């Protein structure tokens, strides 16, 4: 949103930290991604054997990439509740990434009021999974200077026009699940 501000745009986006963790390596035992939707928790095992897991945002705006201890504890508790053997593993490292969150949990894939300036952001937790389809519709938007029919609802003016998307439980409002 700092770059957008330089262009004169005010974006309805908050920046939150999402932490991830990795344990010491163990023999292969988790062959799929394990997720717990109610806790926004996920876990998988890396090729080197470490358990990679994370979940939940810290709950306040920040650009820092270091996590807070209460969230570390909460996410570790989720890991142990699902897979009790995790309590025996040592945590090797953790890191945080910045999530750009919109109030309704849906991204922006659109033109702006500034000529030749387009915006694709506010993906909350879902950006990586949605990249192929959103990239295709965003390319169409840029090439034709008009939104593709599949991304028309992801406009910057949807809040001003009262057209929020009913995507609760994904963005900042995780308690609505």
Segments and roles (model prediction):
Residues 1-31:
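Central helical "cap/lid" subdomain
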Residues 2, 6, 78, 137:
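Alpha-helical scaffold segments in soluble metabolic enzymes
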Residues 10, 25-116:
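Active-site lid/adjacent beta-loop-alpha segment flanking the redox-cofactor pocket in flavoenzymes
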Residues 16-17, 75, 105, 150:
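Hydrophobic alpha-helical segments typical of transmembrane helices
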Residues 37-38, 80-177:
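C-terminal catalytic lobe of FAD-dependent flavoproteins
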């Amino acid at each position: 949103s700092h770059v957008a501000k330089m262009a004169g745009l005010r974006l309805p986006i908050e920046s939150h930290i999402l932490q991830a963790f990795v344990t010491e390596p163990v023999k292969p035992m988790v062959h799929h991604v394990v997720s717990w939707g109610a806790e926004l928790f996920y876990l998988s095992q890396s090729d080197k054997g470490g358990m990679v897991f994370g979940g939940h945002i810290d709950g306040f705006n920040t650009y820092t990439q270091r996590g807070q201890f209460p969230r570390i504890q909460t996410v570790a508790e989720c890991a142990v509740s699902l897979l009790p053997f995790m309590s025996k593993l040592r945590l090797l490292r953790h890191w945080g990434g910045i999530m750009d969150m919109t109030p309704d949990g849906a991204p922006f894939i659109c033109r702006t009021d500034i000529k030749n300036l387009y915006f694709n952001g506010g993906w909350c937790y879902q950006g990586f999974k949605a990249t192929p389809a959103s990239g295709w519709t965003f390319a169409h938007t840029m090439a034709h200077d008009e939104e593709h029919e599949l991304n028309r609802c992801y406009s910057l003016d949807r809040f001003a026009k009262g057209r929020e998307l009913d995507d609760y439980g994904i963005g900042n409002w995780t308690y609505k699940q």
